[in-house]
């Protein structure tokens, strides 16, 4: 099976055999077009028309993102493979089994996933969500003034068909885990990036969109002096607001937000920006607003994949040295930021204030998403992470981490 999803992808038809127009004729095919759509192919490389039509329509109408289209395509493709192996659907053409399938067959499929394939309830629910969207938004609903492809009853009129998945505790990267990850690399650039991702609560897809200008603007905020009640001297803020061009907007759109980053972390980033290598590589970009805040060893932009590889490499090293007890994914850094915000005593007057801060800085649309971090009661969590000690501030922890792990960047060191 193969799934392809594109949004606004340029296609050049200048050399295409479809453009066999006489010089005097009006061209029937444009020289270049931009394409948005999706296609799902089976193992024999045959197009699955129903699935592909649904995903293309949803992409073209900005109903789903590219990643969602790929996930849906795979899930629906897996379901189709299961159906084609059942006796009653073996004569069906490509994905036409979806036009005949009944509720009990879908329920048997989910039971097969749990019992034979031993998939988790969460994974089964993910397949269920894809099927429900396929039936509700396409098969049983006409689109573009066309009648619905399916005339049989909708099996999803009552909602999900799979059991509700159990709620698992969020597994986060602790401050000690972060320290060991940082110590597992001898590149100050990589150390700086790991601390920044944790402190800013970034998704891996958001890192390439953080610009040099955003860092500079955030640091200008620290030049502002603040007067606190009962304190006569003006002080600099320990945190600076940083603009993030966030992910998870509708249909691949950017979802801007402000996050709070410790001043110590931003100062560490600026020292990296002062390195000869970063200064040399940033010349290829026009202006600070177009210059990525982090560049790889070759001067290119980080990608989702390269960030995952960085975490995989540093986690493996730390695991082999018995410094950590689990692999740390990029998203675990983001979870660690949430817990750090919830336990820091200098943001908000109470726990609810800090929970709202988590929602805003992580870019959650709904507060109940942020509440996943409250499955462990706050007072118990404090005792678990700091038995018998008083809580440090997040800013203080980041300052201490920078001091303990920062490497000097020499002019001749190309890291």
Question: How should each PLM-predicted stretch be described?
Answer:
Residues 1-13, 388-415:
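C-terminal secondary-structure termini that scaffold catalytic or DNA-interacting sites
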Residues 51-68, 76-166, 180:
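N-terminal core-binding DNA-recognition domain of tyrosine recombinases/integrases
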Residues 157-179, 237-239, 251-263, 285, ...:
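DNA breakage-rejoining catalytic core of tyrosine-based enzymes
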Residues 176-204:
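Basic, Lys/Arg- and aromatic-enriched nucleic-acid-binding interface segment
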Residues 210-267:
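Conserved tyrosine-mediated DNA breakage-rejoining catalytic core shared by Y-recombinases
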Residues 260-324:
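Active-site/catalytic core of tyrosine-dependent DNA strand-transfer enzymes
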Residues 300, 308-356, 360, 364:
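Short, basic (Lys/Arg/His-rich) helix/loop patches that form interaction surfaces
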Residues 362-393:
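Catalytic-site neighborhood detector that most strongly recognizes the C-terminal catalytic loop/helix
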């Amino acid at each position: 099976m193969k799934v392809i999803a594109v949004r606004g992808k340029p296609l050049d038809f200048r050399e295409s055999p479809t453009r066999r127009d006489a010089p005097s004729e009006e061209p029937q095919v444009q020289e270049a077009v931009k394409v948005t759509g999706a296609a799902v192919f089976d193992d024999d490389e045959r197009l699955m028309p129903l699935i592909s039509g649904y995903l293309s329509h949803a992409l073209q109408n900005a109903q789903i993102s590219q990643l969602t289209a790929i996930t849906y395509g795979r899930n629906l493709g897996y379901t189709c493979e299961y159906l084609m192996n059942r006796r009653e659907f073996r004569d069906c053409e490509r994905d036409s089994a979806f036009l005949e399938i009944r509720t009990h067959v879908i329920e048997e499929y989910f039971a097969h996933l749990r019992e034979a394939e031993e998939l988790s309830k969460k994974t089964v629910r993910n397949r269920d969500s894809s099927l429900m969207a396929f039936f509700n938004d396409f098969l049983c609903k006409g689109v573009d003034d066309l009648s619905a492809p399916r005339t049989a009853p909708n099996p999803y009129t009552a909602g999900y068909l799979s059991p509700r998945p159990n709620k698992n505790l969020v597994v986060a990267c602790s401050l000690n885990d972060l320290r060991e990850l940082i110590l597992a690399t001898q590149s100050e650039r990589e150390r700086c990036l790991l601390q920044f991702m944790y402190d800013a609560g970034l998704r891996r897809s958001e890192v390439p969109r953080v610009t040099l200008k955003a860092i500079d603007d955030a640091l200008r905020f620290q030049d502002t002096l603040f007067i606190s009640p009962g304190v006569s001297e003006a002080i600099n803020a320990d945190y600076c607001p940083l603009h993030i061009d966030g992910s998870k907007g509708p249909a691949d759109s950017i979802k801007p937000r402000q996050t709070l980053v410790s001043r110590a972390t931003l100062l560490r980033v600026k020292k990296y920006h002062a390195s000869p290598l970063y200064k040399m590589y940033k010349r290829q970009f026009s202006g600070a607003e177009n210059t990525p805040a982090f560049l790889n060893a070759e001067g290119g932009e980080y990608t989702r994949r390269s960030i995952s590889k960085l975490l995989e490499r540093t986690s493996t090293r730390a695991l082999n040295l018995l410094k950590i007890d689990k692999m740390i994914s990029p998203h675990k850094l983001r979870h660690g930021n949430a817990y750090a915000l919830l336990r820091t005593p200098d943001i908000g007057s109470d726990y609810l204030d800090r929970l709202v801060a988590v929602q805003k800085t992580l870019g959650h649309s709904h507060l109940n998403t942020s509440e996943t971090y409250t499955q462990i009661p706050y007072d118990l969590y404090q005792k678990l992470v700091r038995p018998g000690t008083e809580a440090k501030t997040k800013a203080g922890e980041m300052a201490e981490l920078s001091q303990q792990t920062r490497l000097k960047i020499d002019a001749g060191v190309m890291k």
